[in-house]
Amino acid sequence: MEQAPEDQGPQREPHNEWTLELLEELKNEAVRHFPRIWLHGLGQHIYETYGDTWAGVEAIIRILQQLLFIHFQNWVST
């Protein structure tokens, strides 16, 4: 009977831990470029919309990535 090969590669961090580390890095970068009051409002909106869920974490990551991308894109082109 065939068996799946055992995973011989290095252990990866769990997805959730990696996601939280990414969120922390994005937050640290965002506070360097945007007013804290804006970021606080964004966080409140996400919390009111998604509650304390992984969907909320994913949403805020996506929004922060987009904000930072647009910010840097405009900063470089001027």
Curated annotation (Swiss-Prot):
Homology family: Belongs to the HIV-1 VPR protein family.
Protein name: Protein Vpr
Signal peptide, first to last residue: none
Gene transcribed to yield this protein: vpr
Note: HIV-1 lineages are divided in three main groups, M (for Major), O (for Outlier), and N (for New, or Non-M, Non-O). The vast majority of strains found worldwide belong to the group M. Group O seems to be endemic to and largely confined to Cameroon and neighboring countries in West Central Africa, where these viruses represent a small minority of HIV-1 strains. The group N is represented by a limited number of isolates from Cameroonian persons. The group M is further subdivided in 9 clades or subtypes (A to D, F to H, J and K).
Region (Homooligomerization): 1-42
Pfam families: VPR
PTM (free text): Phosphorylated on several residues by host. These phosphorylations regulate VPR activity for the nuclear import of the HIV-1 pre-integration complex.
